[in-house]
């Protein structure tokens, strides 16, 4: 944790969920009571097909809604894509950009991530930008080099604590059940914090840094209590209300 920075818990449903899944969203909304909600901000990034219905359920009150990706152009002949403006109209306030699955499967470069961040800003969305190394890069002691490249290439000038959130998600831990040690997470988050402070000044020091990579109820307390960890980006555990709420409840103890 970091003093004076409000924690942020984000759930990423990925390509999971149909209308039947909205019952879990209702349960999450009911479980984040007013007293718990004061301790942190919550975001759920549902599939684009559920955004409008999810907004009708949540109303943008206790839980924020986000998209999982957006195109770098505002409109155009891009079959199957979705623009940041479309996400905004459907009820989103945030959008995940540069997730490791997008960077690896779809070969999205830092330049593309940067362009998507700028598109998100044009639409009035907060960009949740993901960075992280592969297992090979970690074994080769290139973690900080990779993060430096990604941070410099993916973040446009003008980043503030109001328009971006950064999630560190080691690629080797995403969806694998493997989790970085708290010492590894502390080292990386301190490094990212330093980079943000150096580039963006005092405003950069306020940018929230989330950890993402097989966060679950059994390891949430250790991870969320780590220095410079201001929250979590949660994948599979966000699909079940009981798991997501158990992670959120950690903030009652910190």
Curated annotation (Swiss-Prot):
Gene3D superfamilies associated with the record: Aldolase class I
Keyword list, A-Z: Cytoplasm, Gluconeogenesis, Glycolysis, Isomerase
Annotated catalysed reactions: D-glyceraldehyde 3-phosphate = dihydroxyacetone phosphate
Active site: 99 (electrophile), 169 (proton acceptor)
Pathway annotation from the record: Carbohydrate biosynthesis; gluconeogenesis; Carbohydrate degradation; glycolysis; D-glyceraldehyde 3-phosphate from glycerone phosphate: step 1/1
Enzyme class: isomerase
Residue sites binding substrate per the record: 12-14, 175, 214, 235-236
Key word Isomerase present: yes
Gene Ontology MF annotations: triose-phosphate isomerase activity
EC number: 5.3.1.1
GO cellular component: cytosol
Subunit structure, interactors included: Homodimer.
Family named by the database record: Belongs to the triosephosphate isomerase family.
Protein name: Triosephosphate isomerase
Lineage: Bacteria, Pseudomonadati, Pseudomonadota, Alphaproteobacteria, Hyphomicrobiales
The gene coding this protein: tpiA
């Amino acid at each position: 944790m970091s003093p004076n920075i409000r924690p942020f818990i984000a759930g990423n449903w990925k390509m999971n969920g149909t209308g039947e899944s909205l019952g879990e969203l209702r349960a999450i909304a009911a479980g984040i009571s007013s007293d718990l909600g004061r301790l942190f901000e919550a975001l759920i990034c549902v599939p684009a097909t559920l955004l409008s219905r999810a907004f009708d359920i949540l109303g943008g009150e206790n839980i924020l809604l986000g998209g999982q990706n957006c195109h770098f152009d505002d409109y155009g002949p891009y079959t199957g894509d979705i623009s940041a403006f479309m996400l905004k109209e459907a009820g989103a306030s945030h959008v995940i950009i540069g997730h490791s699955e997008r960077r690896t499967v779809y070969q999205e470069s830092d330049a593309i991530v940067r362009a998507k961040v700028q598109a998100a800003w044009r639409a009035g969305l907060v960009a949740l930008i993901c960075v992280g190394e592969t297992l090979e890069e970690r074994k080769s002691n290139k973690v900080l080099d990779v993060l430096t490249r990604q941070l410099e290439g993916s973040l446009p000038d003008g980043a503030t604590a109001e328009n971006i959130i950064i999630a560190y998600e080691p690629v080797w831990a995403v969806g694998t059940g493997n989790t970085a040690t708290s010492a590894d997470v502390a080292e990386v988050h301190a490094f990212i914090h330093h980079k943000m402070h150096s580039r963006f000044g005092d405003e950069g020091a306020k940018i929230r840094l989330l950890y993402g990579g097989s966060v679950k109820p059994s390891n949430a307390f250790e991870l969320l209590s780590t220095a410079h960890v201001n929250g979590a980006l949660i994948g599979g555990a966000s699909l079940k209300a009981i798991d997501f709420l158990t992670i959120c409840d950690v903030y009652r103890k910190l």
